[in-house]
Amino acid sequence: MPRSARVRTLLLGLLGAVALVAVPLTQTASATPEQSYETSVFNNTNVQRVKYDRVKLKGSRCLDGFAERHAKRMATERRMYHQQLGPILKACNLSMVGENVAYGYPNGRAAVTAWMKSPGHKANILNTKYRLIAVGAYQDKDGRWYVAQVFGRSA
């Protein structure tokens, strides 16, 4: 086989392999409504922080479990309340922790907008000492959203 034919065959083989690998990647499941809401809160929180010259917060797996469980608990009980923060401090090895909670907002952007209109919630979002964030969002049986936003700083 001439050299040009071998190169063409090799290139076609490589393109076929790339196509086979690319197909499954485009067929991945889309984000759940909870994940979309959480991502919106996360991103909109960082938009506000940048707007006020604060560093962007990074996600935390440890905090994430607490935020998600609390949002689910609030939705299941159909009431909004703060969770105990002491266990989070210890479990996630933090020097400080804070929380914003909300319910009834149709999306993450609306929740962050409301928090920014409340001095205490805004102070949490813009606190220069926080470096970590996690968000949990869950709907009750009537479709009403409950969200927990947990902030932290490593010890």
Model-identified regions with their sequence ranges:
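Functional surface patches built around histidine and acidic residues
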Residues: P2-L14, V21-A155
